Amino acid sequence: MPSVKVRENEPFEFALRRFKRTCEKAGVLAETRKREFYEKPTQERKRKAAAAVKRQLRRSSRDVTKRQRLY
């Protein structure tokens, strides 16, 4: 769990903003959303495989556009 020490003469809003930023960097909210509901192992594998395919398509389309722009 991320922690933030409030400095002297620091407004609460600034400390809260720093805390939110550290939580975002640590991935706390993403982890809680992921664990909110149980996901079967087969569903998890399907989701990860689909994400990998999508990532691969995105990378290959970037390479194609880079090759075409030879002007």
From Swiss-Prot:
Biased amino acid composition, Basic residues: 45-59
Q: Does the keyword Ribonucleoprotein apply?
A: yes
Q: Which GO terms describe its molecular function?
A: structural constituent of ribosome
Family statement drawn from the similarity comment of this UniProt entry: Belongs to the bacterial ribosomal protein bS21 family.
Q: Which GO terms describe its cellular component?
A: ribonucleoprotein complex; ribosome
Q: Which gene encodes it?
A: rpsU
Q: Name one Pfam family in it.
A: Ribosomal_S21
GO biological process, any: translation
Q: Does the keyword Ribosomal protein apply?
A: yes
What are the annotated disulfide bridges?
none
| This protein's name | Small ribosomal subunit protein bS21
What ranges does the record give for the region Disordered, renumbered to this chain?
39-71
Superkingdom, according to UniProt?
A: Bacteria
InterPro entries the record matches: Ribosomal_bS21, Ribosomal_bS21_CS, Ribosomal_bS21_sf
Q: What is the lineage of its organism?
A: Bacteria, Pseudomonadati, Pseudomonadota, Gammaproteobacteria, Lysobacterales
UniProt feature, compositional bias: Basic and acidic residues: 60-71
Q: Which UniProt keywords apply?
A: Ribonucleoprotein, Ribosomal protein
